[in-house]
């Protein structure tokens, strides 16, 4: 939303071709590779357990069967498998690209007050995951036969689209005031996320949904942390040429980094676990290690293939 809204005047097909095709082909290629990986481990004689080491969500259900890989590949047009969990975001991204030209037409005509009203209603919708957990599963007209409740048309990631567009106009606050507000917002969001997740993690009866509730992306605590980063970055000025080049390269490689990184999560967890670091250290060390490896691989692909790498890495 910060970069693309409002969408510039162009035919609908031109926008879709430029945006969707750029993510569609890498998405399909990497989805197939992730789903063929279990079969490949069997071809080269590796034990079946290595699949669970790479992809934790399939532990206990590992299969090196080619037919099982083909079944998962056949499901790509409908949903992701547990071997490429991170692809959930690409299905979402394609949906946002489909929606964006229509949303942009409203943004072009809406005044600041109308955008603010939309954002406030969206903020209210962010409490729905918690209300659904602690008040009632069915809220505001939803039922087994109707999943579209009162706030449905304001809910979801389109709020982040509008938020990005709204905050890119900047603010007149001083650097100190902006950083203080960002710190308070981030601390508030992080404390809710950490406290809720920790409580679920220490509860033997907690379900997978309980574990994930407090880092649901469309929730008020995640919004607080996201907005904090948005506001803080607005005050950052980068003038060092080497850093500018590095950031530009990261931007270029960003989609490829995302495509590749899930192959590295399991091995990185096992590798860094051998160093007996405290958990608060393991997580950032693992994140940095995965990022650098994925960035290096993606940059290498661009160096070898040039512009053709876009079809594979995005």
Model-based region annotation:
Residues 1-2, 92-100, 155-165, 223-233, ...:
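Hydrophobic cores of alpha-helical transmembrane segments in multi-pass inner/ER membrane proteins
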Residues 1-19, 30-54, 237, 264:
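Juxtamembrane transmembrane-helix termini
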Residues 131-141, 194-207, 268-275:
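Juxtamembrane "helix-exit" motif on the non-cytosolic side of transmembrane helices
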Residues 172-248:
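Alpha-helical transmembrane segments and terminal signal-anchor/GPI-anchor hydrophobic tails
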Residues 236-251, 262-314:
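C-terminal "closing" transmembrane helix and its immediate cytosolic amphipathic cap
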